[in-house]
Amino acid sequence: MVFALVRMNTLDWIVLLVTMVGIAAYGAWHTRHPGHLDTYLKGDKTTKWGTIGISVMATQASAITFLSIPGQGFESGIGFVQNYFGLPLALIIVCAVFLPIYRKLGVYTAYEFLGQRFDSKTRLLGAGLFLLQRGLAAGVTIYAPAIILSTVLGWRLDLTIIGTGLLVIIYTVTGGSAAVSLTQKWQMGVIFGGMMTAFVILTLRLPQELGLDGAVHIAGAMGKLEAVDFSMNPDKRYTIWTGIFGGLFLSLSYFGTDQSQVQRYIGGAALREGRLGLMFNALLKIPMQFSILLLGALLFVFYQFQPAPVFYNRVEWQHFASGPAGATLQALESKHAALHTVEREKIRDWLAVRKDDDAAAESAARAAMLDARAATEAVRQEAKTALLAADPHAKTKDSDYVFIGFIMDQLPHGVIGLLIAVMIAASLGSKAGELNALGTTSTIDLWRHFRPLAAHDEVRNVRAARWFTALWGIVAIAFALFAGFSENLIEAINIIGSIFYGVVLGIFLVAFFLKRVGGTSVFWAAVAAQTLIFALYFLRHRFPALDFSYLWYNLIGCAACVGFSLILQAILPRQPVRAPRP
C-alpha cells in the first residue's frame, strides 16, 4: 500500500502565516529599540511570575518536545516521563539557593558569579562549557522541526533551516530578552491549544466500539503504559533511579546554571516572581510531558486499527522504493500490511475475551496478540535493514515522523495549519531563548571581560549583544545544515546536555557550599571531570561496561568535579578565596 502525502491547502497556509508572523511582529514591535543593556538582557526586571513561568517552559519545550516525545511514546511507551522525576526537587533547590544569590549579586549571567567567587579563568571555563553545549543544542533545536517539516511538506531542508533560523534571529536581535519572554507567552498559548485539539481529535478518531477506555487498556497490554521501572540494570536508559538521581542533577544544572534558563527568571520584578515562575514549572512539567507521551501511546493504538506504513518517514521510503531496492521494499510493505491485519484481529480477539472474565483465555489471547505485534515489528526492522542495505547513510529512525504523519493524514485543513504553527512556534520559542542566552554570555563573560573599557558604554554593549546573538544564530543554522542525528531528537538534546551539565553543576556547588576551595583547584577539577565524561561517552562502544544510561553522566560529572576540587585544594599551594560582592 502506498501512503500518499497530504499537502497543506490555502486555509492551512493562512492559519500558519497569520499565527507565526503575528507573534513575531508583536514581540518585535512591543520591545523594539531597548537603549540600555539591562533592558535588552533582563527586560528591565519587570517580568511577572506568569510570564516567567511560561517563558521557562517555552525555552525548554522546543519543537522536539512536540515532534519527538509523541514518537517516543509511540515507540517505547511512557517510561520516558521518569526522566523528569527529579525536576520538582531541582526547582525547589534553585529557588532556595541559586536564585537568591543571583538576585543579590545583580549579575547578568550565572558565570559572572563564578568570576566573583573564584577567578576569571573559572568564569571563562563555565561560560565556555555553556557556549559549547548550548551552541550545539541550538543547532539540534533548529534541525529538528526543519527536517520533519521539509520532509512532510515537501520543502527543501536547507531553505527550511535558513528560513526558520533567520526569523527567530530577527525578532530576538530586535527586542532582546523582553521580546523572547513576550513572544513565548503567545507561542505557548498556540502550543497548548494545538496539542489539546490534536488529543481531542485523536480520541474521536478511535474506533467507536473501543473508546478512550479501551484504547488505554490496549496500550497497557502492549507495554506502552509502564511509567515506572524499578530495575537496577544500569543499561536501561529510563528507570526511577536514573530519573530521581540522574534527572535531579540534569534539571538542577539546566535550571540553575544554564544561562538560557537563568536569564528567564533573574529578570523578574522581585525574588518572589522568579520563585513563583519556577514553581509553576515544578507543578506542570511532569503532567505536561506525561500527557504528550500518552498522546504517543494512544497514537500507537490508533494505528492498530488503521492502515499503517511499514516506515513512517514516507518521503525517505518512497525515495528508495523508486530505486533498485524497490522490489524488496514493496514486498516488505505487502508483508507488513498482511501481518498488521492479523495483529488487528488478535487485538479484537483479546478485547472480546476480556469481557468474559476468563483469566486463562485472556492470558492466551494476550500472548497471541503480543506474538502478532512482535511479528509486525520484526518486519519493520527488516525494512530498516533493507534501507541501510540500499544506502548505509539512510536515516532509519522514523519515530519522530509518527505525529506529524498523523497531523497530515487525519486532521482537517485549518487544524493542520494550526499544528504546523505549533511546531514552528515551539522551535522559535526555544531557539530565541537559547540565542538570547548565548548572546548575553558572549557579551558579558567574553567581550566585556576582554574589553573592560567598553563596559560603561551602553550603546556599544547593546550593539555587541545584538551582534553576538546574530552570530550564534548563524552558527546554529550552519550546524543544523551539516548535522545528522541517529538518536531520537529529544534524546539527542538530553545527551548533549548530560555530557556537560554535571561538570558545570559541580563548579557551582563548590562555589555555593565549599567556601575553602579556591579557583585554581575547581578549575583543574572541572577540566579533569569533563575529560572523564568525554572518555566515558566516546569509549562506551569499545568497553561495554561503560555503556550505561547517559543520565548518570550528570551525577558522575558533578561528583567528580566536587571530589577532585577537594583533593586538589588539599595538595595545591594555598589559594586566596573570594567572597562574592553585590
Where are these regions (language model features)?
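Membrane-embedded helix-loop-helix hairpins and adjacent transmembrane boundary segments
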Residues: 1-582
